[in-house]
Amino acid sequence: MNWLAQLPTQRTPWLLFSGIVFLLEITALFFQYKMGLAPCIMCIYQRTAVLGLLIAGIIGTSNPEHRGVRLLAYSVWAVSSVWGFIIAREHIEMQTTTDPFAFSCEFEPNFPAFMPLHEWIPSFFAATGDCGNIDWQFAGLSMPAWMEVIFALFAATLFLLVTSRLMTKRSL
């Protein structure tokens, strides 16, 4: 347990975390540009949550020994993984509902007016797909179902790290 509690204070685990999250973003772009799967609004929101995880990893990598930096990284990690899980869950409900009027997909992402990411970087944040379509599956799970699993694993990992740190070090 002490080994696990020490991980957040080291740079290598944060780099590994950032690398894994970066690979998720690259995978999303591969699905979009090489496999021709058009991302929908919910996909873009999930992509944004993954970007939040990447930002958390970069923050943690910058100075993992500093408690304030770790707290900021933990916070961004928690918000991104929980928000991503909620968005993925809602996306699954959109795909599996039999009521065609239960959900509607917006035409463009609802980013804040001061930060219209879909206008600044349309190749990454523009949504061109339909939220109700299931265009890809692996092992019986759709893309949002896999993202739900991934976000849950990220949240569980954070919970495990924070809990072990609190139990052994009595500090974050």
Swiss-Prot record:
Topology versus the membrane: Multi-pass membrane protein
GO biological process terms on file: protein folding
Any one cellular-component term (Gene Ontology): plasma membrane
Parts of the chain that traverse the membrane: 14-30, 49-64, 72-89, 146-164
Keywords on record: Cell inner membrane, Cell membrane, Chaperone, Disulfide bond, Electron transport, Membrane, Oxidoreductase, Redox-active center, Transmembrane, Transmembrane helix, Transport
Subcellular location: Cell inner membrane
Cell inner membrane is among the record's keywords: yes
Molecular function (Gene Ontology), one example: electron transfer activity
Family that this chain belongs to: Belongs to the DsbB family.
Cited function: Required for disulfide bond formation in some periplasmic proteins. Acts by oxidizing the DsbA protein.
Name under which the protein is recorded: Disulfide bond formation protein B
Provenance organism: Pseudoalteromonas translucida (strain TAC 125)
